[in-house]
């Protein structure tokens, strides 16, 4: 399970990196002086639920002219349920020349809803917008 999670996280982070860098390159092919730095943070929440069912049976055996015997059978069934939620957050900072953008560049934050299955990628985009009018291809709007 841990292997699947790390694979999913790596997939999401590389996807976001590649997408943003290609978008920036496609949109501003004239400008060569910008950098794309990527920060990947992962929040992991682990819920552990432990249930123990204890079954106690007591059978008193009584014999005539003998000591009473008590047989006690204890059956314990521990159930452990571990639920792990990992939500990777990819932060991409595009630093552009000072004449082109406000100081500090702009941030594109990709926030994912859980770990996607191999066939799908789920990305929620949050974009901080220091200025308007900058759009990109593939329907992702950076304004």
Curated annotation (Swiss-Prot):
Could you tell me the superkingdom of the organism this chain comes from? Answer: Viruses
Keyword list (alphabetical) reads: Signal
In the UniProt record, the signal sequence range is 1-26
Q: Please give the name of this protein.
A: Protein RJ1
**Lineage, opening ranks:** Viruses, Duplodnaviria, Heunggongvirae, Peploviricota, Herviviricetes
